[in-house]
Swiss-Prot record:
SUPFAM superfamilies: Metalloproteases ('zincins'), catalytic domain (SSF55486), TSP-1 type 1 repeat (SSF82895). Residues 584-639, 872-920, 925-985, 986-1046, 1049-1113, 1125-1179 form the TSP type-1 domain. Keywords: Cleavage on pair of basic residues, Disulfide bond, Extracellular matrix, Glycoprotein, Hydrolase, Metal-binding, Metalloprotease, Protease, Repeat, Secreted, Signal, Zinc, Zymogen. Zn(2+) binds at C247, H431, H435, H441. This is A disintegrin and metalloproteinase with thrombospondin motifs 16. Disulfide bonds join C364-C415, C390-C397, C409-C488, C448-C472, C516-C541, C527-C548, C536-C567, C561-C572, C596-C633, C600-C638, C611-C623.
Length: 1222
């Protein structure tokens, strides 16, 4: 039990942190027993200190021997070195540690990570002017260890002992981080602790963002707020503050190499010179070595300090190395650091910013120019930055890393950028390096789930706190290692041994109730409400007043799960049983040999076996050795008229459209070594070539003059004994595995000087010569020339200089090299079939030309020279098509011994064969889908559809024929597809017209017009009218003309307006009258005599009403002071503004006293200043047989000047005036 004093001090120091609650989204870890996601539980750690959560444990660390007996508390590396010098200890580099705390008692069996750093590893510091310092890192300073926990299967440990214990402990249940406590905190805890004083803090990886760091604890002791560390993707939280992994860049880019003056030649390391690596075998499960260069930027240097940064970075990489040795990866990957570069200042050509994409591009280009002084290069480069990076902008955001996919071993793409986030940085590096190995995120284009808690999950959130490699990651890695690109990883590291001893299990020390308290607080207990729950798979706990909940973490090994039962390996078994032990994988039987890939010329056959007998499980090891074996088959020569195997593969694409066009393809062979096994073809008649396939068919020769063959995209060695992988070679005499005893090598030097621009004989090489080598001893301006005895020049003849390259003549292949910085060189393995004369085209000074060749010994057994035979042979061109019927041109050629073409005069002209066009490739082509052009999209925006004709066809007998769709490859190409998915601009939406305001004659009708979004894939939304200003707004009103109204329906009673009140106060009256009127179609009324409307019922309306009901004020003619008061005076009414139809008349009203303006009149007594007048209807003259029209073009001005009431204007402008009265 922990002492109360220690716990109290810890709670006091971390009081402020304990007030912070776990984000609500962390509840995704604790599921209620009911399983309802809508019923979230409160955070399990609310209101309690860190120590009470069970996520943290203060442990005491000390060294023990292999038996577990105490050795010393001095565990730091320099202390152990001093102690080992004083006392010889058994075990060599083995280290045994004990971590003991209130909740954990762990025994660590470790071994020095001797292969973490390459021989000659150095740390280089770069400043503005270049290298500032180079620090050697001798092997005895290696303070990094890897190993496992004793008696805990499937566990791993990666720690450094440089300055206390720092690193990672992985169990099958969860991942832990271990850190030393700061010295000032250690001393305080030591004064309050009883027994072993705690020196380290052990906490789960899922809580790292809350873990105490040295500067944070110092800030807390000063009663300041805890500085919030960077969030990263190893948090379980899914809230807005979570760091997401915007990484794994699929963009296949190739940055331009930097200029020569920007290349940096660092001397931070001097690794041992590599031997020439053998080619990596396909499908081999061998130990692979990733030689890694680590670069640390200035921001991260400032954060950790120059004195601590090396230890910190190597500790992180030691953890990364352990992650890549995890058994779930399905391979043996060793991370070996070949150099560490510390950037104290900005470097030319390297731009590091918040923008992760730009930083990655710059770093990949910059590191491509780095190499050791001995010319060695790293396989992989890692940039560690202290900046808060973002994948898409130059501002801080939630990105943790960035990397190209499948960039490993590439000079320009084997690089990653990683943001420093504490010890969790190791998982970021492993994740991004996984992308470089060709891995993509789980759940993105594969069958693995995002939430399974694997290292390649889009967001690093462990399952039960444990992180592993998914089956998809294993497949991606296996696929990458089977390519030629992985050749840089062929180095083999030394294996690391592990110790395993029996010991008491954690579940025996801490029962299920105690484990619940650690996870959910002091009041939590094992949930006993549902006995069907298996605590060996998920520990279910409950607190008072709450439902059962779990973090989906199994109970610890050895926990009691029933009567005489305990948990072992996730299963509840009888007490004493070990449960499922680690099962190591074993190979299945070999499969039968596959059919040969070629019928002649040397094909490939293979057989496979799987690691399934049984599969590795419960921490078992993966099978060692090869999953596939290969052998050559059908090695006999192909007939002389057969088509070249590589040319046949190119011809297969003649019937396939390339960017919309058909071409005739021929092999393009001027390739770099890494591209020999890619199918590069050049379009006949054009000057471009293209890689039509990333690998040729198995058995294709790597090059024309090589026995090596391509297998699964890699060039594999074939010996002269025709055995795959054999190192057998021919000696100078052409004898396979010979010792040069059957021939004599002739050597000489030609150093004469002559006049320039002439050919001079140097040496004559007889027929049958082998191992020919002619070379300049120094660079000169002269040229080596070769001809036969008949003065036919094959190289540099007739004062014409040929390009360097491969040349075939005299029955042999010659390799001609000429460079401006190297001497001229001509080589050939031979043998030649005619005498060759080597000459020198003399140009200036002759530094000397050396030559050598081999001839059979005179005493060797010779066979009499056979007389040459001359015969005709038909040489056919390639078929115009690869199938379905084509034509090829045939011509006759004269050959010596059916090998060497000679002049036609050597052959009998009477036996010359008939030549011309002949049919070829008449066999039907494979069925394929014939697709037409897409139709016009049904919509211009907002998501439409388009279709195209698709039919299954096969070319046979020179024409295309339709066949059933079932005979074509499935699935069928899509017939329909979406198109124009971009959002549509807003537009005016019109509603239906309402009914006309009239039932007959002329009226008005209305409709609604609104601006709406027109995207059919989303719900229409009303927008402001300003959003539709790009097009005019439709009308909302329009005139409607109906049938002519009947005469009798025009008559109606109209009521006039109320007249003015007869008095201003004290009881007056107002009147209005009913008049008979006739309404025209135009809407204008005409007053008629009342008798014409007698047949119509009068409306029941009040025609008189009282008004002026306000009492008249009673006031003296004088004011309160006895002075006289002013009175209101009104002028006569003005003339009415209209003679009919309603007008207005006005008058002036003033307050006067004795003829002078005054201001003391009562406002309520003020008379009206305006009044309605002439409210009767205007008469309309109607003449039979005429119609209303305008007689002048200026009639539109009449109503604007109010002249329609004038008799002349109303008559001459009848139409305009009638409309103005509407």
């Amino acid at each position: 039990m922990e002492s109360r004093g220690c716990a109290a001090l810890w709670v006091l120091l971390l009081a402020q942190v304990s007030e912070q609650q776990t984000p609500a989204c962390a509840l995704g870890l604790a599921a209620a027993a009911s399983g309802s996601p809508e019923d979230p539980q409160p955070p399990p750690f609310s209101g309690s200190s860190w120590l009470e959560t069970g996520e943290y444990d203060l442990v005491s660390a000390y060294e023990v021997d292999h038996r577990g007996d105490y050795v010393s508390h001095d565990i730091m590396h320099y202390q152990r070195r001093r102690r080992r010098r004083a006392v010889t200890q058994p075990g060599g580099d083995a280290l045994h540690l004990r971590l003991k705390g209130p909740r954990h008692d762990l025994h660590l069996d470790l071994k020095a990570a001797s292969n973490l750093m390459a021989p000659g590893f150095m740390v280089q510091t770069l400043g503005k002017g270049g290298t500032k310092s180079v620090q050697m890192f001798p092997p005895e300073e290696n303070c990094f260890y890897q190993g496992s926990l004793r008696s805990q299967g499937n566990s791993s440990v990666a720690l450094s002992t440089c300055q206390g214990l720092l690193g990672m402990i992985r169990t099958k249940d969860t991942d832990y981080f271990l850190k030393p406590l700061p010295p000032h905190l250690t001393s305080k805890l030591n004064r309050s602790a009883q027994g072993d004083s705690p020196s380290h803090v052990l906490y789960k990886r899922s809580t790292e963002r809350q873990a105490p760091r040295e500067n944070e604890v110092l800030m807390i002791t000063r009663k300041r707020d805890l500085a919030r560390p960077h969030l990263h993707h190893d948090n379980f939280h899914l809230g807005p503050s979570q760091k997401q992994h915007f990484c794994g860049r699929r963009k296949k880019y190739m940055p331009q190499p930097p200029n020569d003056d920007l290349y940096i030649l660092p001397d931070e390391y001097k690794p041992s010179s590599r031997h020439k690596r053998s080619l990596l075998k396909s499908h081999r499960n061998e130990e692979l070595n990733v030689e890694t260069l680590v670069v640390v930027d200035r921001k991260m240097m400032q954060s950790h300090g120059h004195e601590n940064i090396t230890t910190y970075v190597l500790t992180i990489l030691n953890m990364v190395s352990a992650l890549f040795k995890d058994g779930t990866i399905g391979g043996n990957i060793n991370i070996v650091i070949v150099g560490l570069i510390l950037l104290e200042d900005e470097q030319p050509g390297l731009a590091i910013s918040h923008h992760a994409d730009h930083t990655l591009t710059s770093f990949c280009q910059w590191q491509s120019g780095l190499m050791g002084k001995d010319g060695t290069r790293h396989d992989h480069a890692i940039l560690l930055t202290g900046l808060d990076i973002c994948s898409w902008k130059n501002e801080p955001c939630d990105t943790l890393g960035f990397a190209p996919i499948s960039g490993m071993c590439s000079k320009y793409r084997s690089c990653t950028v990683n943001e420093d986030s504490g010890l969790g940085l190791a998982f970021t590096i492993a994740h991004e390096s996984g992308h470089n190995f060709g891995m993509v995120h789980d759940g993105e284009g594969n069958m693995c789930k995002k939430s399974e808690g694997n290292i390649m999950s889009p967001t690093l959130a462990g399952r039960n706190g444990v992180f592993s490699w998914s089956s998809c990651s294993r497949q991606y890695l296996h696929k990458f290692l089977s390519t030629a690109q992985a050749i840089c990883l062929a180095d083999q590291p030394k294996p690391v041994k592990e110790y395993k001893y029996p010991e008491k299990l954690p579940g025996q020390l801490y029962d299920a109730n105690t484990q619940c308290k650690w996870q959910f607080g002091e009041k939590a207990k094992l949930c006993m409400l549902d006995f069907r729950k298996d605590i060996c798979k998920a520990l279910w706990c409950h607190r008072i007043g709450r439902k059962c909940e779990t973090k989906f973490m199994p109970a610890a090994e050895g926990t009691l799960c029933g009567q005489d039962m305990w948990c072992r390996g996730g299963q509840c078994v009888k007490y004493g049983d070990e449960g499922p032990k680690p099962t190591h994988g074993h190979w299945s039987d070999w499969s039968p040999w596959s059919p040969c890939s070629r019928t002649c010329g040397g094909g490939i056959s293979h057989r496979d076996r799987l690691c399934t007998n049984p599969r590795p499980s419960h921490g078992g090891k993966f099978c060692q050795g090869s999953t596939r074996t290969l052998k050559l088959c059908n090695s006999q020569r192909c007939p002389l008229d057969s088509v070249d195997f590589r040319a046949a593969q190119c011809a297969e694409y003649n019937s396939k459209r390339f960017r919309g066009w058909l071409y005739k393809w021929k092999p393009y062979t001027q390739l770099e070594d890494q591209d020999l096994c890619k199918l590069y073809c050049i379009a006949e008649g054009f000057d471009f070539f293209f890689s039509l396939s990333n690998k040729v068919k198995d058995g294709t020769p790597c090059s024309e003059d090589s026995r090596n063959v391509c297998i699964d995209g890699m060039c594999e060695r074939v010996g002269c004994d025709n055995v795959l992988g054999s190192d057998a070679t021919e000696d100078s005499c052409g004898v396979c595995k010979g010792n040069n005893s059957d021939c004599v090598t002739h050597r000489g030097l030609y150093s004469k000087h002559h006049s320039t621009n002439q050919y001079y004989h140097m040496v004559t090489i007889p027929s049958g010569a082998r191992s020919i080598h002619i070379y300049e001893t120094n660079i000169s301006t002269s040229y080596i020339s070769v001809r036969n005895s008949l003065k036919r020049y094959y190289l540099n003849g007739h004062w014409s200089v040929d390009w360097p390259g491969r040349y075939k003549f005299s029955g042999a292949t010659f390799n001609y090299k000429r460079s401006y910085k190297e001497p001229e060189n001509l080589t050939s393995p031979g043998p030649t079939n005619e005498t060759l004369i080597v000459e020198l085209l003399f140009q200036g000074r002759n530094p000397g030309v050396a030559w050598e060749f081999s001839l059979p010994r005179s005493g060797a057994k010779k066979t009499p020279a056979a007389q040459p035979s001359y015969s005709w042979a038909i040489v056919r061109s390639e078929c115009s098509v690869s199938c379905g019927g084509g034509k090829m041109n045939s011509k006759a050629g004269c050959y010596r011994d059916l090998k060497v073409p000679v002049n036609a005069s050597f052959c009998n002209p009477k036996t010359r064969p008939v030549t011309g066009l002949v049919p070829c490739k008449v066999s039907p082509c494979p069925s394929s889908w014939s697709v037409g052009n897409w139709s016009v999209c049904s919509r211009t925006c907002g998501g439409g559809t388009q279709s195209r004709p698709v039919r299954c066809t096969r070319r046979a007998h020179y024409r295309d024929e339709s066949i059933p769709a079932s005979l074509c490859p499935q699935p069928e190409p899509p017939i329909h597809q979406a198109c124009n998915s971009q959002s549509c601009p807003p537009a005016w939406s019109t509603g239906p017209w309402a009914e006309c305001s009239r039932t007959c004659g002329k009226g008005w009708r209305k409709r609604t017009v609104a601006c709406k979004s027109t995207n059919p894939s989303a719900r229409a939304q009303l927008l402001h009218d300003t959003a539709c200003t790009s097009e005019p707004k439709p009308r909302t009103h329009e005139i409607c003309l109906l049938k002519r109204c009947h005469k009798h329906k025009k008559l109606q009673w109209l009521v006039s307006a109320w007249s003015q009140c007869s008095v201003t106060c004290q009881g007056g009256t107002q009147q209005r009258v009913l008049r008979c009127a006739e309404k025209y179609i135009s809407g204008k009324y005409r007053e008629l005599a009342s008798k014409k409307c007698l047949h119509l019922p009068k409306p029941d309306l009040e025609l008189e009403r009282a008004c002026g009901l306000i009492p008249c004020p009673k006031h003296p003619p004088f004011d309160a002071s006895g002075s006289p008061r002013g009175s209101w005076f009104a002028s006569p009414w003005s003339q009415c503004t209209a003679s009919c139809g309603g007008g207005v008349q006005r008058r002036t009203v003033q307050c006067l006293l004795r003829g002078q303006p005054a201001s003391d009149c009562f406002l309520h007594e003020k008379p009206e200043t305006s009044s309605a007048c002439n409210t009767h209807f205007c008469p309309i003259a109607e003449k039979r047989g005429t119609f209303c029209k305008d007689l002048f073009h200026w009639c539109y001005l009449v109503p604007q000047h109010g002249m329609c009431g004038h008799r002349f204007y109303s008559k001459q402008c009848c139409n305009t005036c009638s409309k103005s009265n509407l």
